[in-house]
């Protein structure tokens, strides 16, 4: 993860790419003391260009890296676009997300729910899986990515 920082107090345009976690002393050494703005990013989430507390940005990126235990980083932008106004908003509500790994449809989610339930096997074969999947899709909030399905529960 990298960000391109510029010093807004410098009269000449000066900027540099920094790898997260950002070393604040290195930023000051390279760009000089001042006020820094994020002018470009290479991040697995969307971040508007602008002023950010660099220590907070380090913490956000650390949390995002920890998501890899929970869901793929490559899906973060899609999740963010669907449900959240910013990465900060996503972090505040990450516990509302359910990740259905290796599912590529609501039908597969329905199968998982039924398989993980306490229904007797002979009853499971009589369920209309397509109808159950349609009901899930109508009543719940899902996002289907290339590799997974996510659900937001409020």
Regions found by a protein language model. Give the residues of each.
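Structured domain cores in non-transmembrane regions
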Residues: 24-89
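Acidic, proline/glycine-rich low-complexity IDRs
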Residues: 6, 111-154
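Short, Lys/Arg-enriched charge-dense amphipathic segments
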Residues: 58-65, 95-100, 144-148
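A short, compositionally biased
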Residues: 1, 32, 137-138
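Extracytoplasmic/secretory-pathway segments with low complexity and glycosylation-like composition
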Residues: 80-117, 122, 153
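Alpha-helical structural elements
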Residues: 12, 78, 94-95, 127, ...
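Short, extreme N-terminal segment that most often corresponds to the first beta-strand
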Residues: 1-26, 148-154
């Amino acid at each position: 993860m990298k960000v391109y920082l510029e010093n807004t107090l410098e009269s000449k345009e000066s900027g540099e790419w920094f790898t997260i976690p950002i070393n604040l002393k290195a930023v000051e050494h390279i760009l000089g003391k001042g006020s820094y703005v994020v002018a470009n990013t290479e991040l697995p989430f969307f971040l508007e260009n602008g002023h950010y507390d660099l220590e907070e940005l380090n913490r956000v990126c650390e949390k995002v890296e920890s998501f890899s235990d929970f869901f793929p980083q490559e899906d973060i932008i899609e999740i963010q676009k669907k449900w959240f106004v910013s990465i900060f908003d996503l972090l505040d509500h990450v516990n509302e997300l359910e990740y259905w790994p290796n599912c590529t449809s609501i039908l597969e989610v329905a199968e998982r729910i039924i398989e993980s339930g306490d229904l007797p096997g002979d009853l499971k074969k009589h369920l209309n899986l397509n109808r159950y999947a349609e009901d899930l899709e109508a009543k719940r909030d899902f996002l289907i990515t290339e590799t997974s399905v996510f659900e937001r529960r409020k």
